[in-house]
Amino acid sequence: MTTTTDSVLRAGVAKHGDELRLTLDPRFQGLPGTAHGGSVLAAFQAVAGIAGRQEVRGVYRKRVPLGTPLRLTVAPRNGGLACRLFDEADTVLVEGGVNPVAKAPTSAMAPGATGDPLPVSSTCFACGLDNRLGLQAQLLFDEASVWGRWAPRETAAAADGTLAPIALTALLDEAAFWLGALASGESGMTTELAVTLHRSIAFGAPIIVAGARSQTRARADDDRFWETNVTASDVSGHLVASGRITFVAVRGAARRLVTGLLALNAPSVLRRIFPAYTR
């Protein structure tokens, strides 16, 4: 029997008195030692149990550790659920929630025709080549966009025969990270995520994820923060999910990231994204 992302995610949620504890499996890694942003959103969505079109939000205050039971509080709010995730010192790591959305879908962004591969890693949940639970997605980029066509792996099936929502939240978060990195020339993290799940899609259908580089803009009051817009659609262009995700550039963080990525990626690719950190 295949171990799935959905089953592993749900197994990490446990009752603890009147509260919950969330333990994110190490295979849900994003940057080394840190949970992928899409995994926390998916945990909020799983706990909420809301059907239909919905928005899942998360504001990340600090990096989220893996393999550690974290206190998760939930409370009804505006027909949905408010969620807050705390570390062992009772510091807020992520706050957000899930709410039904009535607004009609917007159109999906068009993918590029060709492009150069974005870097991949060994262990990342979204792109890690050796992460057997992960998506193993390969995104591309050109002067206009970040995009990719992803064929779901059997680990991404939900129990009801649809694509697990964590695949969509992670793909959108991954695309937003690279849009921010390309715009800033720096590594960093996604810090404010709002993903709308417009509809479910049968497991096995390919997903097109895309984001326009021209729509990636620095905040006027703080140019470390970059606002991105990303979409996920089926091959016919019908929207499945969309996201408004903020990337924060952390000056100098790319130095360590590039060092690790050089084992699997050509210097010429890394140089185009992180020119100040790649020889």
Name the predicted role of every residue range.
Residues 18, 52-54, 68, 144, ...:
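A generic structural signal for short beta-strands and their flanking turns/coil linkers
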Residues 54-92, 195-239:
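Hydrophobic beta-sheet segments that form the core/acyl-binding groove
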Residues 34-53, 163-188:
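Active-site helix/loop of acyl-thioester processing domains in fatty-acid/polyketide metabolism
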Residues 100-102, 215, 247-249:
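A short acidic/small-residue loop/turn micro-motif
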Residues 233, 239-246, 254-256, 260, ...:
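Mixed-charge, glycine-accented linear interaction segment located at domain edges/termini
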Residues 1-22, 78-80, 87-91, 97-158, ...:
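Non-catalytic linker/capping segments at the edges of enzyme domains
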Residues 27-34, 153-167:
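Short histidine-centered catalytic/ligand-binding loop motif
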Residues 93-96, 241-243:
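A structural microfeature
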